[in-house]
C-alpha cells in the first residue's frame, strides 16, 4: 500500500512533471494527465498526490427518445476532451440536504476517476461508488476521493445516474414492445460498471478487481446489483453502507411501482399530459413528480426478478465478499427533521420534541398496535430523559439495526461477509450554518461516516482523533477492496462478529450488534 509518508514526494514530482505513467497504465499517452479511453482521449488534472479525471461520458445523454429508455452507449469524440471539471448532476429537486444540488440538465451520465499519481508495478484495485440521496438527489462529484485514492492506493470511480421520475418512474404508457418501465437509473449503473471493466486499466486500475460500494440509496442499489442476473461479472466485492436491503421499505414491487406511477400521473395530468412527457423540460417533470412515489429499484420483472430478501434466502445472488454495516444512530437524522418541522410549525426556534411527539412518532413508524410494545422497550427514562433520543433509538433499531443483523446473517450463509458499526461520537456537523444543531447529541447518525472516507465540503473538518479514525477506516475499506477480507472475523450464520468503529483508544472493538440494537425484541415483534 502507498504509505502516507510518500505523499509529499509524490506531490513534488507531480508539480515538476517528473512522474510518467508506467507500462501498466495501458491508456497512457506519455502525459500522466492524458488518458485514452475506449471512446477517446481525456485530459485530467494533477491535484496533489492524485490525478483526477471528471465528467467522462459513459453513456449517451438520455434526451429525446432516450428519455425513459435503456442506457445507450456514449459516442466517440475526436481530439482531447477536457476532464478537469465535473459533469452536470442529473435532474433533481435538491431537497435532500446536504447531498445534492438542484439540476435540470439531462446530459449527466458521466463518471469521475481519481487515481494515485505515482506509478505502480501492478494494477490497483478499483472502487466504484454509488452516491446516496433517496434515489432522487445527489451526484458523484460531491464525493471527493483524493484521500481514499492516495492513502488507500486505489482507483476510485464515482458515478452519476438518472434519479427520481426520470430514473425510476414506472407507468404503462412507458412500456413498449415488452420493455419494462422503471429501473433506468439502475441500467445506468450497469453501463457505468461496464465502462469500468473496459477502461480501468487506462487509469492504472485492475479491471479484474472491482469493488462496488455505496451509501444509503447507493447501498440499496449495490444490493440490487448483487441479485440482478445481468450484473453478473461486473464487480468482485461489495460494500453496503447504511443500506441493509432486507428492510421492508428497501424494495418496491413492479405492481406497486406501476400503481404509484399511475396515481402520481393522474395527480399532475391536468398540467402535464402524458403525451407531452417526452418533450417536457426536466424541471416540469422532476418537480411535480418529486414528491410522488418512492423511487428506487423495481423488483419482480425481468431485470430484478427476486428481491434481496428472496435472493439471500435461496442463495440466488452473486456470491462475492461483502462488507456491510450501519451507523449506530442512523435515524437520529430523521428525528432532527421532526424537530426542525416542529420549530417551523410553532415559530419557536428552540422547540424540542416532547412525550406526545415521541408517542406520535412511534405510532407513525410502527402503527398504534405495536407502538405500546416499542415504548415499553425504549422508555424515555432510559435515554437521558430525552424523548428525541428514545425515539431515535427505536427508529434506528427497528429499521437499520434489525435489517443489518438480518442482512449479515442471511448473506453469511452463502458468501464471506463482514459487519461493522460506525459509532464515532461526536461527529462533524454540517458546514452550512443554516443547519442549526439539534437540541440532542446527533451522534453517529445517517451519512455521518462519509467525511471519514471522502473529502466533503458539506461537513465541518475532522479533528485529530477523527482523522486517525478516518485513516483506519480508509485502510479497512481499501484493504477489503484489495483482498476481500476485513481485519476481524467474518459473520457466520449464528454470529455477526461485528466491529464498532470509533475514535480514541479502544474505539475499534468488537460489538454485540444484535444486543445493542435489541434484535431479539424486533424479531419477536414481527
Predicted regions and their residues:
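Catalytic-loop region of hydrolases
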Residues: 28-122, 277, 283, 485, ...
Amino acid at each position: 500500500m502507498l504509505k502516507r509518508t510518500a505523499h509529499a514526494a509524490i506531490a513534488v514530482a507531480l508539480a515538476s512533471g517528473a512522474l510518467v505513467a508506467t507500462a501498466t497504465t495501458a491508456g497512457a499517452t506519455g502525459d500522466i494527465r492524458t488518458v485514452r479511453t475506449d471512446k477517446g482521449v481525456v485530459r485530467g488534472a494533477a491535484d496533489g498526490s492524485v490525478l483526477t479525471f471528471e465528467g467522462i461520458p459513459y453513456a449517451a445523454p438520455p434526451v429525446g427518445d432516450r428519455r425513459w429508455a435503456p442506457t445507450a452507449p456514449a459516442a466517440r469524440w475526436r481530439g482531447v476532451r477536457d476532464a478537469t471539471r465535473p459533469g452536470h448532476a442529473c435532474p433533481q429537486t435538491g431537497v435532500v440536504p446536504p447531498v445534492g444540488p438542484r439540476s435540470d440538465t439531462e446530459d449527466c451520465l458521466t463518471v469521475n476517476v481519481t487515481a494515485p499519481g505515482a506509478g505502480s508495478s501492478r494494477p490497483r484495485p478499483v472502487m466504484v461508488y454509488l452516491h446516496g440521496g433517496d434515489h432522487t438527489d445527489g451526484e458523484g462529484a460531491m464525493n471527493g476521493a483524493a484521500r481514499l485514492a492516495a492513502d488507500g492506493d486505489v482507483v476510485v470511480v464515482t458515478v452519476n445516474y438518472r434519479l427520481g421520475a426520470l430514473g425510476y418512474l414506472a407507468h404503462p404508457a412507458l412500456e413498449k414492445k415488452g420493455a419494462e418501465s422503471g429501473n433506468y437509473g439502475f441500467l445506468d449503473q450497469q453501463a457505468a460498471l461496464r465502462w469500468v471493466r473496459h477502461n480501468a486499466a487506462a487509469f492504472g486500475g485492475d479491471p479484474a478487481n472491482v469493488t462496488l460500494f455505496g451509501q444509503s440509496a447507493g447501498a440499496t442499489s449495490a444490493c440490487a446489483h448483487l441479485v440482478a442476473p445481468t450484473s453478473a461479472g461486473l464487480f468482485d466485492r461489495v460494500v453496503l453502507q447504511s443500506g441493509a436491503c432486507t428492510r421492508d421499505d428497501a424494495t418496491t414491487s413492479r405492481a406497486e411501482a406501476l400503481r404509484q406511477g399511475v396515481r402520481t400521473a393522474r395527480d399532475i395530468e391536468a398540467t402535464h399530459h402524458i403525451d407531452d412527457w417526452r418533450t417536457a423540460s426536466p424541471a416540469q417533470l422532476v418537480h411535480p413528480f418529486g414528491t410522488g412515489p418512492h423511487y428506487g429499484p423495481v423488483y419482480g420483472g425481468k431485470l430484478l426478478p427476486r428481491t434481496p430478501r428472496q435472493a439471500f434466502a435461496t442463495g440466488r445472488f452473486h456470491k462475492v465478499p461483502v462488507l456491510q454495516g450501519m451507523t449506530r444512530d442512523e435515524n437520529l437524522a430523521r428525528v432532527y427533521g421532526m424537530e426542525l418541522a416542529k420549530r417551523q410549525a410553532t415559530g419557536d426556534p428552540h422547540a424540542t420534541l416532547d412525550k406526545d411527539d415521541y408517542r406520535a412518532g412511534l405510532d407513525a413508524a410502527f402503527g398504534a398496535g405495536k407502538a405500546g410494545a416499542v415504548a415499553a422497550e425504549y422508555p424515555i427514562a432510559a435515554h437521558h430523559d430525552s424523548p428525541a433520543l428514545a425515539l431515535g433509538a427505536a427508529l434506528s433499531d427497528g429499521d437499520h439495526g434489525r435489517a443489518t443483523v438480518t442482512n449479515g446473517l442471511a448473506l453469511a450463509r452463502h458468501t464471506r461477509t463482514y459487519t461493522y458499526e460506525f459509532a464515532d461520537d461526536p461527529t462533524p456537523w454540517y458546514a452550512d450554518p443554516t443547519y442549526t444543531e439539534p437540541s440532542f447529541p446527533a451522534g453517529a447518525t445517517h451519512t455521518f461516516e462519509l467525511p471519514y472516507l471522502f473529502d466533503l465540503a458539506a461537513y465541518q473538518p475532522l479533528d485529530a482523533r477523527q482523522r486517525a479514525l478516518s485513516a483506519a477506516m480508509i485502510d479497512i475499506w481499501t484493504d477489503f477492496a484489495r483482498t476481500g477480507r476485513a481485519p476481524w472475523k467474518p459473520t457466520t450464520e449464528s454470529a455477526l462478529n461485528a466491529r464498532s468503529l470509533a475514535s480514541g483508544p479502544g474505539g475499534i472493538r468488537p460489538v454485540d450488534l444484535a444486543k445493542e440494537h435489541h434484535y431479539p425484541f424486533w424479531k419477536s415483534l414481527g
